[in-house]
Amino acid sequence: MISARTRRFGCLAAVVVATLWACPPALAIDRPQVDAGAAPPNGAPGPVQPMEKNGECTGTGVIPGSDFKEASPSQQMLDPSAAWRFSRGDGQLVAVLDTGVRPGPRLPGVQPGGDYLESTDGLTDCDGRGTAVAGLIAGQPSDDGFAGIAPGARLVSLRVTSGKFSARSAGGDPTTARAIVDVTALGRAIVHAADLGARVITVAGITCLPANRNVDQGALGAAIRYAAVDKDAVIVAAAGNSGAAGSASGAACESNPLTDLGRPEDPRNWAGVTSVSVPSWWQPYVLSVGSLTPGDQPSKFTMAGPWVGVAAPGEDIVSVSNRDDGGLANGVPDQHQQLSPLIGTSYAAGYVSGVAALVRSKYPELNATDVIRRITATAHNGARTPSNVVGAGAVDPVAALTWQLPAATHDDKSPVKHVAAPPEPAPKSSLPRIVAFGGTAALLLAVVVAAAITARRRKEATL
């Protein structure tokens, strides 16, 4: 006879098996889908809502012992002078959507594009990052080792974010409130940049959100579709920085899981996304850029995600400063006013935007989709399939300008007017789940039987 204890164990096992069988897997986020019928937002500059300054402006500086006579390791990786034999980016207008750009001797003629924090013209930079990103795109050569990737390109600055400003609190979660302001400002700025004629739009200031946080991005999606399809602009965005660097508003971005071999129908593991990088996750309209070390390895801080398309140097950056003299800089003051090296996927995005300007100048017949395809197809050191850390691999300016690529198929090209939503993941087969739960049930049943036999033998041994 089976003991009461064994019967209780058997009941528990049955409950566990039933629970495992009945509980579905955790719900995954859906990829964002553009409503093709939605109108893009009004792009007019101006604050989305009243903002207040919460800190003094900071200027990037020179870390003691630095020598700018030679090109930085990051610049040596890309070797822009070799690319200039084929293109310098002439005739291309590149929009920089970030903390603003301060013109200077290495950044002359930057066009004002407007401000979405205050009522300036966008040529104010209180953080230093926007000016540095602009320098990587189109900084002018001099008698030192620095130059932007596409010195022939023109720049227009739109200030959309700053760590020195915050929205006046109206209650609720301040992180969500800031995200709403940033997402709204970004959508308007993308439309305005496209209307100004930008052929490349650089989004260096990004927003990171937990996947389960509900922030309406419908207007942003319409803005991205409008710029990428209707206006044929290449949109390049930073993938995001995990850890202290965080997103533009100061919120840290959490890196996502890598490929899940158990989901072959979802090779980029969209189902595993826990943190969203905005606007990078708006695929396939945005070229998202991860960061590399000077040794051509993924940076520890670069945010992984199924949207990452390519990678570029994002550490030990040397670029143009937002100081009064407009000289070079390689450091930014930390909370103790000590200079820390310039790092981040924002700078990597600046490099790739410069490459996009080179490609657009050399191949004016290519649409935005084909430009992105050329940049990703000629990247090197990537895996056989795109990686969630570095995408197709390290951007290669010379290869992007010189390689002969097969003609794009119909599926490679974006529609001219009506944009289809990104495809839903393929339906999952229930067979692996049936096998797994069936195995679990069999194992638990075997444990119950073994427990019953053991209990009976012990009882017989005592007789």
Where are these regions (language model features)?
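Protease zymogen maturation seam
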Residues: 21, 25-91, 105-106
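Substrate-binding/specificity loop regions of serine endopeptidase catalytic domains
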Residues: 207-309, 316-349, 433
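Hydrolase catalytic cores
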Residues: 160, 314-390
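Subtilisin-like serine protease catalytic core
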Residues: 82-94, 99-112, 121-179, 285, ...
